[in-house]
Amino acid sequence: MRLRTRFRMARFTLRSDIVDVPVRLFARSVRAETAALLEEPPGLLVDVLTGTGSVLPEYARRFPQARIVAVDLDSDILELARQRMCEAGFEGLELLADDARDMRLPACVADAVNISFGLHENNWTIRSLILGECCRILKPGGLLVVADYREARGIVRSAIFRLYLLLTEPRWVNEIFYGGLERQVEDAGFEVLKVRDDLPMTRLVLARKPDA
């Protein structure tokens, strides 16, 4: 495994361990709540910026007949996502090692697109390109699910969260707070249907690509 991949894996593991503590203590799984935003089974679900694919088993449990394609630029990280799915008892995950700004997928092909804790890793310009590409591959009326950080509430929590972000995340992560994520989703051509801010450290956004 390449050194770059090992570094990314270490960051994913550290971040997941930290985030999962409040989730396990105070709420049901953020991953399960993310998958639950889709009420109807998608024929094709594309998971963009997959990383290690922590949310994918939840989608597979909820929609066992769905075709799931995982997209990440790092093929080694994608293999870890496949391994995670296999360990959870799910086979058939399709891997696409590709740039999320220019995916080798046809236009209007996906019923749903998911992005979990990947957008904030990129600056505003790249996020806009990724969201535009997600809009391109979605069918008219298709759904976009985005899970990412939300701003902390309370003096103590905010201080701890700011320290966590300073140590683990890029400097532009604050751009997605206070409505920034939803505005950028809308700017990419989506209609925002639902926003959830009631989960630990997490904002969930459900959006729809308008009909042609």
Regions found by a protein language model. Name each.
Residues 89-102:
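Conserved SAM-binding strand-loop segment of SAM-dependent methyltransferases
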Residues 101-113:
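A short acidic, Gly/Pro-enriched loop at the edge of an enzyme's catalytic core
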Residues 128-140:
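A short glycine-rich, Lys/Arg-flanked "PGG" loop and its adjoining helix->strand segment in the class I
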Residues 74-76:
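Conserved SAM/SAH-binding beta-strand->alpha-helix loop
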Residues 25-42:
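Conserved alpha-helix/loop element of class I SAM-dependent methyltransferases that forms part
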